[in-house]
Amino acid sequence: MTRRRVLSVVVLLAALACRLGAQTPEQPAPPATTVQPTATRQQTSFPFRVCELSSHGDLFRFSSDIQCPSFGTRENHTEGLLMVFKDNIIPYSFKVRSYTKIVTNILIYNGWYADSVTNRHEEKFSVDSYETDQMDTIYQCYNAVKMTKDGLTRVYVDRDGVNITVNLKPTGGLANGVRRYASQTELYDAPGWLIWTYRTRTTVNCLITDMMAKSNSPFDFFVTTTGQTVEMSPFYDGKNKETFHERADSFHVRTNYKIVDYDNRGTNPQGERRAFLDKGTYTLSWKLENRTAYCPLQHWQTFDSTIATETGKSIHFVTDEGTSSFVTNTTVGIELPDAFKCIEEQVNKTMHEKYEAVQDRYTKGQEAITYFITSGGLLLAWLPLTPRSLATVKNLTELTTPTSSPPSSPSPPAPSAARGSTPAAVLRRRRRDAGNATTPVPPTAPGKSLGTLNNPATVQIQFAYDSLRRQINRMLGDLARAWCLEQKRQNMVLRELTKINPTTVMSSIYGKAVAAKRLGDVISVSQCVPVNQATVTLRKSMRVPGSETMCYSRPLVSFSFINDTKTYEGQLGTDNEIFLTKKMTEVCQATSQYYFQSGNEIHVYNDYHHFKTIELDGIATLQTFISLNTSLIENIDFASLELYSRDEQRASNVFDLEGIFREYNFQAQNIAGLRKDLDNAVSNGRNQFVDGLGELMDSLGSVGQSITNLVSTVGGLFSSLVSGFISFFKNPFGGMLILVLVAGVVILVISLTRRTRQMSQQPVQMLYPGIDELAQQHASGEGPGINPISKTELQAIMLALHEQNQEQKRAAQRAAGPSVASRALQAARDRFPGLRRRRYHDPETAAALLGEAETEF
């Protein structure tokens, strides 16, 4: 609400307060003398209200200088041939070859019941150039790999054998366009000969993979069919400005490089320029091409019949075949950019073929092919044509005109021609008029057909199109002109009606109840004050109290304002407006009848007394509204156009996820038989033994249960001991102590081993440390006169020592007595004679045994 309107409302409320202050509050009328209208309970735009006329409302005036503009078409039309090109979303595809050597180390466990693969490690290595030459020509490689890591050189040989030359053979695969050649298709997984041992087996496989790679513009990277990514442009040759984000020393180009197909081994193919990239785990190579090998545009459709409509700011290329319109944001054609020169040959060839097919009906004159770019990102190749019938009319007009210039080759104006030029406008009008011609134009030379009798479909389409647009535009122009004139007349009528009843006119304009008053040549509009709708009642009598001849011309109304308990009286106006005065009176007339509308009801007063209430629908409505009946444009079923097919959208992604996952699953299935879990393999074998032992114990009954409990107890004891030892070893102090003890035991064992070795090698020196010195003195004659004894005496002494040692052992055994086990065995022998030793009564046998016993001693 504006400041002026707020001031108007304040003045209005002040005036109402003065008026109400001057009035004396009335006592509520008895219910028998009043009637409550249903409009108090209805939602309406015109509730009961008090509208006070104020000279401080918003001021308005009616315009008297309305001008109706003229409406006319400003479009030019031209026929021609149209070719539409779209962005090429299909990536640039090219063949690549991958070289790699796969080293697979498998750890095999030789179990009791089954062998299992406990570990599998695979490494991939790139192939040097000297070996790629051999692989590309004769499909052979070396079955060994030499690598250096952290200063340590390692050599892996297939089957843990020797380095030899092996052949590559084709292998299977699932991905389309992928072909592999491998030297070793079977993994070396033979276990060792010793049971419960582990052996490591090595497999070296030379692998060549022929596949496709894809790269999208701007060619910052490309992806192979198997999912390998390379961060460089496939057109990079080491010298140009193409993208390259790989290691500088990993790329090189070889000229006149020869690569032989597997089926054509032994031939000498033509050399080519080939790029090589070392990725560390594999080597890639591909044939180098220039960027011109890829065209960024792709031909979509060619339309033989197209109408170019120039609207002033843009050109609409409308086709009848595709029911579509291509809109350009410029009216001037462009030259074909250098980046799109790849389509120039195709455009010239197609346009020439299309024009040859319709040259009997059309002529192109001196017009050339023009290119446009649409707002949707399409490139249009446009060749304007002129119907020969229209060209004939133009020639006849020029021949019959005395001041005409010498005839020239007929050609329609290009869409980029000046729209205001008179010859262009005349030519377009003649072309439209030619579509309405019903008689053929005479030929310009004998024996030549003008082609007007053929009635070509393109002329009919253009004529129908031009006629339809002309009729629609004329109809819309007439409607707009009539609408403007009607608004102008209505403005004049409303201006005159405000001189009679400004409140009604302004309320109809605002769409709600307002108070209006003319102040000279302007109108003051103010708001109305709503009353409490529930307190509004109508007096049944319209006679003036205390007078027999005077009556009210409008019924009396009792009401209260919102937030006010006082009851006031006024008179009911039109559209539920309440007047605060009772001055609308008249001389009472005999047999009078009045109808007053309040909401959706009409109150009927007969002889100035409320007679009845009827519905609003009971009174017929005077229809002053005239509806506009127009014929609508017929429906046009648009053809469904597919700019990019599903196959093109599918091929637009450089990552062929389906092929990558299929290839991965195929490779995973090849090693599924080898990938056995150690725990499962070993536990399965152990479970068989444990299950068999359990069945054996169950068959023994209580004895088996006792044995099982005993074994479980012993096993639990050992388990507790081992667990305690492990816990003690995990403790820092315990671990250090155990390590120190182990080191001490190792040192002690080494010392004892050395001493035992010396004892066995030099026993005399160990028993008599000074024997060497004594021998030296005896040899030099410096020592005392001691001479060694003879060998016979030495043997006698040794024999005496041996017998003495044996006698001491027997004496110790007799002194120790028999053991408990010996006594128990002897008691059993005495109780059971069968267990006694058999006594030999044979003298010869006894003598032989005694001889053996004496020999032992």
Swiss-Prot record:
Membrane topology: Single-pass type I membrane protein
Compartment annotation: Virion membrane; Host cell membrane; Host endosome membrane; Host Golgi apparatus membrane
Topological domains annotated Virion surface: 22-732
Region (Involved in fusion and/or binding to host membrane) location: 108-114, 192-200
Example GO biological process: virion attachment to host cell
Signal peptide: 1-21
Record-annotated membrane-spanning stretches: 733-753
Record site: Cleavage: 432-433
Region annotation Hydrophobic membrane proximal region: where it falls in the sequence: 678-730, 709-729
Main location class: virion
Low complexity biased stretches: 416-425, 845-857
Protein name: Envelope glycoprotein B
